Amino acid sequence: MDDDAAPRVEGVPVAVHKHALHDGLRQVAGPGAAAAHLPRWPPPQLAASRREAPPLSQRPHRTQGAGSPPETNEKLTNPQVKEK
């Protein structure tokens, strides 16, 4: 049996118990325990430099798929049109 196993409740999957145990380990107990928190990521200095980064170069977006452009000659695109 694991040393860090949470007490089991019949019919509850093991993963649920492990998740509950993990959440319990992350909680801070009592005043002055703020240093026990896990470090935030990204650190504030790194997060600030990311916000100030220049935007990526804008590439024109293609609105049409690959291949030939559609025909513009009405006679070719609509066979029901007859010459006058």
Curated annotation (Swiss-Prot):
Residues 31-84 are annotated as: Disordered. Expressed in testis and kidney, and, at lower levels, in urinary bladder and liver. Expressed by a high proportion of tumors of various histologic origin, including melanomas, sarcomas and colorectal carcinomas. It comes from Homo sapiens. One of its GO terms (biological process) is immune response. Residues 75-84 have a biased composition (Polar residues). It comes from the Eukaryota. The lineage of its organism: Eukaryota, Metazoa, Chordata, Craniata, Vertebrata. InterPro entries: KAAG1. This is Kidney-associated antigen 1.
